[in-house]
Amino acid sequence: MNQTDLKHKLSAPFDFNEWKNILAQMFPKIDYLAKETSVDNNLVKNGGQIGVIHLNDGRSLGLFKFEVADNIHISRNRKGLREIAAKYVDQDIINGALVLYYSGIQTEYRLTFVSKQTVFDSEGNLSIKETAPKRYTFLLGESEPCTTAANRLIELINKNKRGSVYLDDVTEAFSVERLNKDFFNGYKTQYKRFVDTLTNTKQHRDYVKKLLGRLVFLQFLQKKGWMGVPASSTKWENGDKNYFAKLVEKYLDNNRLLSDVLEPLFFGVLNTKPEEREALFIKKGWNISLLTEFEGIPYLNGGLFEPDNIDNLTIDFPYSYFKELMDFFAIYNFTIDENDPEDSEVGIDPEMLGHIFENLLEDNKDKGAFYTPKEIVQYMCRQSVIQYLKTHEPSEQYAEAIEQLINDGIVNPILQNKNIAIRFTRLLKEVKVCDPAIGSGAFPMGILYVLYHAIHHLHSHAEPHGNFNSTQTKRDIIQNNIFGVDIEQGAVDIARLRFWLALVVDAEEPQPLPNLDYKITCGNSLLSRYPIDAPIENVFVEYNKGKKENEKMTLAKYKELVSAVSYTHLTLPTILRV
């Protein structure tokens, strides 16, 4: 079996008989159980452990297969899959496991590697402590590219032919870090091609960064299915997940693709409300017929698509540049659900927007801009919330319970009391977190997920009869708990977009979104107009000088204004309304 054959098999609907053949070529020995274990769970129709994989280093992997319930959306319901793994996989393995999740009614399925290793102490002796399970997943099936998966799994097949498949080889095959490195290296090559066409001034480099950043972001949006939504649809669904590649193909050899098609899309559609699009197209002299083609595309309230001075440049690139860029993107699986250090899809997640920005930021070392590994971000965010809770609930009886809740997602019996669960939930909802140098949003995104998971874990105890609303909880945290400042406008734009993607990941259609203009702003947090100990009521003294009484700003009026713009509706184009 070569890589092309394997990719074809991975892109087909799930067939376990086919997978038995693939697994036999990947691993030296597999013992299938005479009787498969079965589970009883509302998340699973049937399945359990079906065998044991033996590796050449003497280690073994459990082999599991689950047919998930119809309400589990395989391509984006990682939470439900985590719950299955936590209950039926994580506790029964030593070195790791391979898990196949599939559905009889969905085209996608998942191959997940669960890594769980014993820890050695400083003297090299085996410790009884084991690492927390980490999950790495390939999303496969008819609508997925499967290029990376085929490339990685063929490596295991070739190593098996040489008789040397070790646990480290399996871990490497599912490595997200390696994928990110490969993607970024390829991205830099694409970036350099565009820049080299111009004069390589800072202005032109900034232009290319923003152009490519816009196109990367739209890869995530089309993955959600919100690009090219059919005109007959009354909901945001069934969009074309290959929309941009087809758009570029449609305008074959058009060397004015940027001016004629992409700029009207960026500024006239993505940055303009549906009812205002036609007037803007006429004013700009854009091809009015494009409006019909772009009807199934939402209006975004993010700064990435607002035209700025750099967009006044008259620039075009050869058609081949955009065609090769789309071909490059097509190699990778884009996932809008941000990866967690302990649960990662082997694909490009929204953090890559920040990674690209930080690595292409000129003089980034002089500006103090460095990429912080996600594990460190997660640790710092968890510790910050732990210390906050311990400060407000200093009783020693809660110390261990707080750490278990934030670090492990375990609700200690002491926190299961309804009144106590309500009290801790209120504390989590009231905390204010400000990052004075937000960069592309790594730390605030980390805080978002720490608060979200803690509130989620406490919910069944604080509100035993209430339904947990995932999207609303995230929206409330973003709106009420998180603030940030950065001197780079590009960083602010990326951070806002990452929060936006965090909301849409669970949404069935665009909902009113928080307006983040007053939450994540561009500015220099090292400079201040006000003494650090000045009463907050005095911050408008300078602003109010010389103004009439009815023009003066007060803290109450400011809060009222912020509240008035706190939500901005994303509306369906007129043709999509019932």
Question: At which residue positions do the language-model features occur?
Answer:
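Conserved SAM-binding loop
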Residues: 495
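Short, exposed interaction patches on small structured surface elements
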Residues: 525-567
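Short, polar/flexible loop-turn hinges at active-site or ligand-entry regions and domain interfaces
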Residues: 174, 200-202, 226-228, 365-367, ...
